[in-house]
Amino acid sequence: QNAQADQSNLRNIATRFTGNKVDLIGAIATPAAQTMANATNKIPIVATAVTDFEIAKLVKSNDKPGTNVTGSSDMAPINSLLELIVKIYPNAKNVGVMYSSSEINSERQVQIFKEEAKKYNLSVREATVSNVNDIQQAAQSLVGKVDLIYTPTDNTIASAVPALIKITEKAKLPVFAGEGGEVKGGATAAIAIDYYELGKIAGTMAAEILEGKAKPETMPIQYQKNFKTVFNEASVKNLGLTIPADVKHELVK
């Protein structure tokens, strides 16, 4: 059931699932997981594409959920991305961060990014959006003030990457993203979250619950273990970027 990013649709789907007394609910992304969790505390819920289950109040602890919810997290390797940034742009001083102010998972990633950025003497300037219509204005507000832009795994930004790239490409401003899909959309680089892999992890977890081998309340949140570094070929060319020889990577068009 696809809610088409509509909260009322989500609630209707949750009502339908609980009314049908399904054996397990799979939920993709935080809003879906939260709506399903609000609808039932009995039916097991396995979620994916949720950055921090604990921050989203879906579990008591990521290590030991203590609720009917578990799943796979799309928390990106932020420190590894920062290492990549300073390797490619050693003289960078100011980083712009764009994210949705209404997405709690984005706020958590930005909090971590700001803490980690201090280790690299990077100053962070934030530009928040409330919906996709704000993206170009937010991006424009960073032009001339930052050396590059970071976007976390954020549903609002991810749904309108071309609007962001329209501004950054013209300004020759690199964009480092939280997930690989944005690189395909024109962002410069990412140490990529693989949502297909996260789906497989969540599917395996769901199977174990349905087979009676595990219970969500004692099943720790799981994470992607291996990441690929991906660059957008057109962005690299537009920026005149030289990728260091020791950076193992893939180019996408």
Regions found by a protein language model. Name each.
Residues 1-253:
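Short hydrophobic alpha-helices and adjacent helix-cap/hinge residues
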